[in-house]
């Protein structure tokens, strides 16, 4: 299997560089970025509280199995799947003084660094893609329970991504982080965040854009978010 793929002029790549979409190029970038930020926000939440918004966790987890998504938003089921991420993009880019937003931003930067290393390892990409394919088969034919799938995805992360030179340090409540279930959730979210970071880069996103296009990114995320159902403070949908 070839991973998260698309086609352009008969060539194939690991990321969706050629998705057909009704969204503008900037909107597509922001949707992918929302996937990164959403994963980062939930990593922080699980690490600190042991809780997470199930609907958005499910959307992030399922994005790992979107090998042939026809559009950017379809990677997450639909754009509603990254509603929390869109709001979090605005939070991260407009309020750098909030402690939770700072932590979220640190995870985002870490995921982008991790993706940069992952992107240079086609051998690792093939292993991750193959093993995710096996987990996806299990989800389709046996159990699709998100927590059970997270345990399998966590093992993939430990066997592959955790061996890259850069390591993301997760900070939170030791009591929560020592629980196997929460550790699995965190690793699953980190891999989902890396997946979105890969997509973001394929769509033209670059870390320097936070500095030079931060206002535009936040405004675009806000506009997209306003078109969707509201999200409560704990991350759930109304």
Regions of interest found by a model, annotated:
Residues 14-84, 91:
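Leu/Val/Ala/Ile-rich N-terminal alpha-helices, chiefly Sec-type signal peptides and the beginnings
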Residues 21-35, 71-74, 96-103, 120, ...:
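Non-transmembrane, amphipathic alpha-helical segments
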Residues 31-45, 106-117, 188-200:
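Short, hydrophobic/amphipathic alpha-helical patches that form generic packing surfaces
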Residues 42-43, 52-58, 116-119, 131-134, ...:
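Conserved mixed alpha/beta catalytic, RNA-binding, or beta-rich assembly cores of soluble enzyme
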Residues 65-145:
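Long amphipathic alpha-helical segments with strong coiled-coil/leucine-zipper propensity
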Residues 137-206:
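Conserved binding-pocket/active-site segment within a compact domain
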Residues 185-238:
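Alpha-helical oligomerization segments
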């Amino acid at each position: 299997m070839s991973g998260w793929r698309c086609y352009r002029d008969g060539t194939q790549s690991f990321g969706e560089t050629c998705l057909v979409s009704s969204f503008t190029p900037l909107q597509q970038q922001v949707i992918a970025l929302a996937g990164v930020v959403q994963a980062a926000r939930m990593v922080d939440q699980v690490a600190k509280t042991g809780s997470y918004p199930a609907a958005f966790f499910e959307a992030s987890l399922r994005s790992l199995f979107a090998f042939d998504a026809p559009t950017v938003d379809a990677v997450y089921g639909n754009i509603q799947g990254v509603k929390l991420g869109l709001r979090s993009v605005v939070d991260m880019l407009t309020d750098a003084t909030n402690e939770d937003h700072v932590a979220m931003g640190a995870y985002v930067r870490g995921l982008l660094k991790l993706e940069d290393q992952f992107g240079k390892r086609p051998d690792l990409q093939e292993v991750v893609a193959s093993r995710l394919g096996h987990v996806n088969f299990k989800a389709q034919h046996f159990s699709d329970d998100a927590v059970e799938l997270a345990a399998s995805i966590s093992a993939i992360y430990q066997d592959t991504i955790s061996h890259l030179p850069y390591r993301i340090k997760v900070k939170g409540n030791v009591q929560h982080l020592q629980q196997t279930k929460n550790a699995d959730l965190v690793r699953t979210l980190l891999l989902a965040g890396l997946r979105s970071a890969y997509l973001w880069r394929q769509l033209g996103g670059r870390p320097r854009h936070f500095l030079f296009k931060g206002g535009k990114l936040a405004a675009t995320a806000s506009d997209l978010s306003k078109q969707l159902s509201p999200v409560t403070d704990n991350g759930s949908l109304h």
